[in-house]
């Protein structure tokens, strides 16, 4: 669909998850992926050229890690944020069936897991992941700007695709480099 004409009510509908307005909009324009890459970088510092964003429409695989020894590990769980939150709080020592009605499942009847590359023309927001974004206060500027823009979109003040256009303008602004790249005192 033409993103320019997407209304807040449409952007909030997620096919697999029930989430709040803000995170649903971040998911619909792929800002959630941008924020996830920044989060991964902060937790596990890596060369910013060494990541790849992929889409998993089934929303069951939440992370994939490729190891130098040739192994690959997947983090697979149902579309319920209770699972990662409970495991973080209880340090992976929780029987999730006590908290959730969902049981662990795996694709049935030979159903395969599907993955696809992000179409950067359709989701240009992922192009904001330049090396500058990882530096010092870059993530803070991105997140704060996005918060304001999503709120403006929800209130009908800007269009859906304006979120990206304004964010891009922020990161192209000469003052971004002036403030974001400096180390905090």
Model-assigned labels for residue ranges:
Residues 1-185:
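Catalytic, metal-anchored helix/loop core of enzyme active sites in primary metabolism
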């Amino acid at each position: 669909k033409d993103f320019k004409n997407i209304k807040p009510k449409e952007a909030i509908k997620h096919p697999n998850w029930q989430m709040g307005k803000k995170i649903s909009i971040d998911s619909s324009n792929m800002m959630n992926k941008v924020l996830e890459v920044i989060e991964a970088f902060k937790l596990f510092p890596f060369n910013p050229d060494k990541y790849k964003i992929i889409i998993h429409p089934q929303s069951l695989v939440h992370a994939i890690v490729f190891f130098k020894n040739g192994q690959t590990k997947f983090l697979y769980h149902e579309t319920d944020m209770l699972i990662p939150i409970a495991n973080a709080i209880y340090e992976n020592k929780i029987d999730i069936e006590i908290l959730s009605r969902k049981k662990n499942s795996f694709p049935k009847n030979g159903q395969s897991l599907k993955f696809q590359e992000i179409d950067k023309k359709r989701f240009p927001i992922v192009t904001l992941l330049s090396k500058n974004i990882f530096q010092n206060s870059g993530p803070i500027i991105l997140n704060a700007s996005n918060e304001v823009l999503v709120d403006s979109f929800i209130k009908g003040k800007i269009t859906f695709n304006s979120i990206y256009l304004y964010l891009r303008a922020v990161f192209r602004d000469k003052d971004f480099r002036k403030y974001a790249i400096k180390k905090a005192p």
